């Protein structure tokens, strides 16, 4: 599933081609996504894009009278293409732009979403979200407070959007490895120093992934059709049985809450 770096990479890729440009119309080839494509999107006609933002794993396209909310789901990607390029099997939504380009949404598993809202504050998918991990609000004081009485393992807690948004399976595993913290540790067992280190490495790992265009394991593509190259830098994720890059101990691969988890039993305590 695309996580924060992949969504931010998509945002940065499409923004220069959309802001200040008019959406001539939308083409919805298959509206049966995770939720049905909102009727307002079918009716788009001659509306300018004012901004392209991101909240958590949602892309937000600001229009004069509302917002398009896009979620990439499990396998979605957005590309900027010539409007003359024919659509393929899994190309479900196009925004046809006045600059001769289209924003094309591709999603083999159709678990993404194209939604509409008049105001962001009113939409349920954006309610009750925690802070952005790259913001000043996400700091050691905040994490220590939220972990203090939490009797659950730290990895699923990091992946809870009520704690912090956008830290999915890949980046939770990678950040815990970089911080030297075992994914099974109770959140309440983390010391102040460990909270400081974990916040620091989460920010560093996410920023590094954004620099590399995100992580492509299967479906994700950047807006120019290139894969994300952070996959080449993964320390533990997807490396079950391979030697730890630090100590050489075989990387462990297990399941936590039905999600794959990877760690080094020697480096993470």
UniProtKB/Swiss-Prot annotation:
Cofactor(s) needed for function: Zn(2+)
Gene3D superfamilies: 1.10.8.50, MutM-like, N-terminal (3.20.190.10)
Keywords: DNA damage, DNA repair, DNA-binding, Glycosidase, Hydrolase, Lyase, Metal-binding, Multifunctional enzyme, Zinc, Zinc-finger
InterPro entries: DNA_glyclase/AP_lyase_DNA-bd, DNA_glyclase_Znf_dom_DNA_BS, Formamido-pyr_DNA_Glyclase, FPG_cat, MutM-like_N-ter, Ribosomal_uS13-like_H2TH, Znf_DNA_glyclase/AP_lyase, Znf_FPG/IleRS
MF-aspect GO terms: 8-oxo-7,8-dihydroguanine DNA N-glycosylase activity; class I DNA-(apurinic or apyrimidinic site) endonuclease activity; damaged DNA binding; zinc ion binding
Catalytic reaction(s) noted: Hydrolysis of DNA containing ring-opened 7-methylguanine residues, releasing 2,6-diamino-4-hydroxy-5-(N-methyl)formamidopyrimidine; 2'-deoxyribonucleotide-(2'-deoxyribose 5'-phosphate)-2'-deoxyribonucleotide-DNA = a 3'-end 2'-deoxyribonucleotide-(2,3-dehydro-2,3-deoxyribose 5'-phosphate)-DNA + a 5'-end 5'-phospho-2'-deoxyribonucleoside-DNA + H(+)
Enzyme Commission number: 3.2.2.23, 4.2.99.18
Active-site residues from the entry: 2 (schiff-base intermediate with dna), 3 (proton donor), 57 (proton donor), 259 (proton donor)
Binding site for DNA: 90, 109, 150
Zinc finger (FPG-type): 235-269
Cofactor note: Binds 1 zinc ion per subunit.
GO biological process: base-excision repair
SMART domains named in the record: Fapy_DNA_glyco (SM00898), H2TH (SM01232)
Alphabetical list of PANTHER family matching this protein: FORMAMIDOPYRIMIDINE-DNA GLYCOSYLASE
Function noted in UniProt: Involved in base excision repair of DNA damaged by oxidation or by mutagenic agents. Acts as a DNA glycosylase that recognizes and removes damaged bases. Has a preference for oxidized purines, such as 7,8-dihydro-8-oxoguanine (8-oxoG). Has AP (apurinic/apyrimidinic) lyase activity and introduces nicks in the DNA strand. Cleaves the DNA backbone by beta-delta elimination to generate a single-strand break at the site of the removed base with both 3'- and 5'-phosphates.
Record note on quaternary structure: Monomer.
Protein family membership: Belongs to the FPG family.
Protein known as: Formamidopyrimidine-DNA glycosylase
Species annotation: Klebsiella pneumoniae (strain 342)
Gene giving rise to this polypeptide: mutM
